[in-house]
């Protein structure tokens, strides 16, 4: 490709509304342009990267035995009503109507469509297992699209759905998808972790997220420093402390704390160690409970894990915190004065709180706290559960090492769905015993457009993008200095362009009448891994300057050796 026949569209300045580095560099490198909130046009450079990501995904899915299909973006509402998600999905589901006023949705996902297809196409257990995938546009009407294509409303996704007659068969495909995803992200040159995850609203029995490690990530990725254990923050278990509860050394005392409405204020004003404080949170109880609320207690320096809390049998789903009015109606005190002593609703405490002694907590009286509280002496030990987020330095749940926490960008997710959709939509085949058998499902997603942004978040410097070789838009940039004035430079540039292209190498030759500084800046911004610079001065010595984008190292290579050198560097 020649720049004179290409839409380069680079920008010198960073657009003001681009918050994260991937969004900034995708705009500056001429990869995308914003059409409307959360909607982007992909320009030629961006499409080249996108297609490389797609091709790697497609190759590994095919290698894993999956079969490619293509389903409509527009889906009839009847399928969503049948699955029960028409009411459940919320405002992210874009609902539309055709000219006959028939309701449809712009698909955010395709579980309903694939399940409808399979129930009409399959009739026997002998046809299973099968795993279907597509690479298709999705639309989710995000309330606040941000970070460019990282959280856009329209995006490209690889979604796969497998069908089985047994849990064992599902597990085999799940393991194959886990391995395929690991190959996909490894081939792309990404530093990632596969982490255990909560199944969330999709449901099912097992789930793993594939997280690309990056400072701009929205997720906390938890992993051991001494083993393969990895999980997301919602799933990671906070191991119970090994140390027994220390004996009481203080009497419980009611203390005036009129200006301490938060743990931070209490600690600062009374010079308390934060590890000796407890915070109390009131949440809605399940319907028909004797009490409308449940009290959840965590140590002052810990955070409640809302996913874990929501799974408690006493707690309503979705997790809903009590309002100040509801709290005052219960204990006649504000949220900053709550504690376990004389709490009139069921109390559940975190494992760490269970081993505390001589601790401080609200007295359920405005402006007052109890200091020196001890379990069993001042208040009975309540039910104990793991309800907090882990923190760095906690012991790993597998007993090997301690936990580290890094930020991650979720680029893939695999689920064992079970029979959630097949039961709702009556997707069944004739089993080996001749009776109808509801199908067991798995689903497996990769955010193709998000992978592009995540790769940039992990691969950039102050000059631009530093693409992993496998997904770079071009492999080699040829920069002929003053080629319009030097026949020798022009002739060699054309010769190398033809020879490299004949080797199947993707080349961008900058044949613009531009200053060398502009040419260098654009190629570094775009992130092409290998650059060769042709200039009369070096050619006097039969030399070509070669530069590797990732480490910035330069070297002179003889003109007769440069093609062989590049072929070896790129193809190995």
UniProtKB/Swiss-Prot annotation:
Keywords: Aminoacyl-tRNA synthetase, ATP-binding, Cytoplasm, Ligase, Nucleotide-binding, Protein biosynthesis. Gene3D superfamilies: Anticodon-binding domain, Bira Bifunctional Protein, Domain 2, YbaK/aminoacyl-tRNA synthetase-associated domain. Its main location: cytoplasm. Disulfide bonds: none annotated. One of its GO terms (cellular component) is cytosol. GO terms for molecular function: aminoacyl-tRNA deacylase activity; ATP binding; proline-tRNA ligase activity. Its EC number is 6.1.1.15. It is found in: Cytoplasm. GO terms for biological process: prolyl-tRNA aminoacylation. PROSITE patterns: AA_TRNA_LIGASE_II. It is an enzyme of class 6 (ligase). Transmembrane segments: none annotated. It catalyses: tRNA(Pro) + L-proline + ATP = L-prolyl-tRNA(Pro) + AMP + diphosphate. Pfam families: HGTP_anticodon, tRNA-synt_2b, tRNA_edit. Consists of three domains: the N-terminal catalytic domain, the editing domain and the C-terminal anticodon-binding domain. PANTHER family: MITOCHONDRIAL RIBOSOME PROTEIN L39/PROLYL-TRNA LIGASE FAMILY MEMBER, PROLINE--TRNA LIGASE. Homodimer. Catalyzes the attachment of proline to tRNA(Pro) in a two-step reaction: proline is first activated by ATP to form Pro-AMP and then transferred to the acceptor end of tRNA(Pro). As ProRS can inadvertently accommodate and process non-cognate amino acids such as alanine and cysteine, to avoid such errors it has two additional distinct editing activities against alanine. One activity is designated as 'pretransfer' editing and involves the tRNA(Pro)-independent hydrolysis of activated Ala-AMP. Belongs to the class-II aminoacyl-tRNA synthetase family. ProS type 1 subfamily. NCBIfam families: PRK09194.1, proS_fam_II. This is Proline--tRNA ligase. It comes from Klebsiella pneumoniae subsp. pneumoniae (strain ATCC 700721 / MGH 78578).
């Amino acid at each position: 490709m020649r720049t004179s026949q290409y839409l380069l569209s680079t920008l010198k300045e960073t657009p003001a509304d681009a918050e994260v580095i991937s969004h900034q560099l995708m705009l500056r490198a001429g990869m995308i342009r914003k059409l409307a909130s959360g909607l982007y046009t992909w320009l030629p450079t961006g499409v080249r990267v996108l297609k490389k990501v797609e091709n790697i995904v497609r190759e590994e899915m095919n290698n894993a035995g999956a079969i490619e299909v293509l389903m409509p973006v527009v889906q009839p509402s009847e399928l969503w009503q049948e699955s029960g998600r028409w009411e459940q999905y919320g405002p992210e589901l874009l609902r539309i109507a055709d000219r006959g006023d028939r309701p449809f949705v712009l698909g955010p996902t395709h579980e309903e469509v694939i399940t409808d297809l399979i129930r009409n196409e399959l009739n026997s257990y002998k046809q299973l297992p099968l795993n279907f995938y597509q690479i298709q546009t999705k639309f989710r009407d995000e309330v606040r699209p941000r970070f460019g294509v990282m959280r856009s409303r329209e995006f490209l996704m690889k979604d796969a759905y497998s069908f089985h007659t047994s849990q064992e068969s599902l597990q085999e495909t799940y393991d194959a998808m886990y391995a395929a995803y690991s190959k996909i992200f490894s081939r792309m040159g990404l530093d990632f972790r596969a982490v255990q995850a909560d199944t969330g609203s999709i449901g099912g029995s097992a789930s793993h997220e594939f997280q690309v490690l990056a400072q701009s990530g929205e997720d906390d990725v938890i992993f051991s420093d001494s083993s393969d254990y990895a999980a997301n923050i919602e799933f990671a278990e906070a191991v119970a402390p090994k140390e027994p509860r220390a004996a009481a050394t203080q009497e419980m005392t009611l203390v005036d704390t009129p200006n301490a409405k938060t743990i931070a204020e209490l600690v600062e004003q009374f010079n308390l160690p934060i590890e000796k404080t407890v915070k109390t949170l009131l949440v809605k109880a399940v319907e028909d409970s004797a009490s409308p609320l449940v009290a959840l207690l965590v140590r002052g320096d810990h955070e409640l894990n809302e996913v874990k809390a929501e799974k408690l049998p006493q707690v309503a789903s979705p997790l809903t915190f009590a309002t100040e009015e509801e709290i005052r109606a219960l204990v006649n005190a504000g949220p900053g004065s709550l504690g376990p002593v004389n709490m009139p609703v069921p109390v559940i405490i975190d494992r760490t709180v269970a081993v505390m002694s001589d601790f401080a907590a609200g007295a359920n009286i405005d402006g007052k706290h109890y200091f020196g509280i001890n379990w069993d002496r001042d208040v009975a030990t309540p039910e104990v559960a793991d309800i907090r987020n882990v923190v760095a330095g906690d012991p790993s749940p597998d007993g090997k090492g301690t936990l580290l926490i890094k930020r991650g960008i979720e680029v893939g997710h695999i689920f064992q769905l079970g029979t959630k959709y097949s039961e709702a939509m009556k997707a069944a085949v004739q089993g080996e015993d001749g009776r109808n058998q509801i199908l067991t499902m798995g689903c497996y997603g990769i955010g193709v457009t998000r992978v592009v942004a995540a790769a940039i978040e992990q691969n950039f410097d102050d000059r631009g993008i530093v693409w992993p070789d496998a997904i770079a838009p071009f492999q080699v940039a040829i920069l002929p200095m003053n080629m319009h004035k030097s026949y020798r430079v022009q002739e060699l540039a054309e010769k190398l362009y033809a020879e490299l292209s004949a080797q199947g190498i993707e080349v961008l030759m900058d044949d613009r009448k531009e200053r060398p500084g502009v040419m260098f800046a654009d190629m570094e911004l775009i992130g092409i891994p290998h650059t060769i610079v042709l200039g009369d001065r070096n050619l006097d010595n039969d030399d070509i300057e070669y530069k590797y984008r990732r480490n910035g190292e330069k070297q002179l290579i003889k003109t007769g050796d440069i093609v062989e050198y590049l072929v070896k560097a790129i193809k190995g």
